[in-house]
């Protein structure tokens, strides 16, 4: 189980990303359309002044149940440990153990 503080920190990052997503998109579009180098520099500085955690690259997928950041299955939103336990307990519809 991940520490509560790490899970809360990740939630805070998700809120920041959502809050600044539109502004980041606008600044990047202006940078793309800018003609002069000075204008691009000013827009780049504007982008750099935004909070660091508002960038989507700082997000990390976490298991919805345990909060584990590694071995994450995107299709289910679970870590491999929780996925395995839930599959064995028939809590995931349509998931069967393979054998050949």
From Swiss-Prot:
GO CC term (a single one): small ribosomal subunit
Family annotation (Pfam families): Ribosomal_S14
One GO term (biological process): translation
Keyword Amino-acid biosynthesis: no
Molecular-function GO term, any one: structural constituent of ribosome
Main subcellular location: plastid
Keywords linked to the UniProt accession: Chloroplast, Plastid, Ribonucleoprotein, Ribosomal protein, RNA-binding, rRNA-binding
Disulfide cross-links: none
Gene3D superfamilies: 1.10.287.1480
SUPFAM superfamilies named in the record: Glucocorticoid receptor-like (DNA-binding domain)
InterPro entries in alphabetical order: Ribosomal_uS14 (IPR001209), Ribosomal_uS14_bac/plastid (IPR023036), Ribosomal_uS14_CS (IPR018271)
Compartments where located: Plastid, Chloroplast
Homology family: Belongs to the universal ribosomal protein uS14 family.
Role according to the record: Binds 16S rRNA, required for the assembly of 30S particles.
Quaternary structure annotation from Swiss-Prot or TrEMBL: Part of the 30S ribosomal subunit.
The name this protein goes by in its record: Small ribosomal subunit protein uS14c
Organism, as annotated: Chlorokybus atmophyticus (Soil alga)
Encoding gene per record: rps14
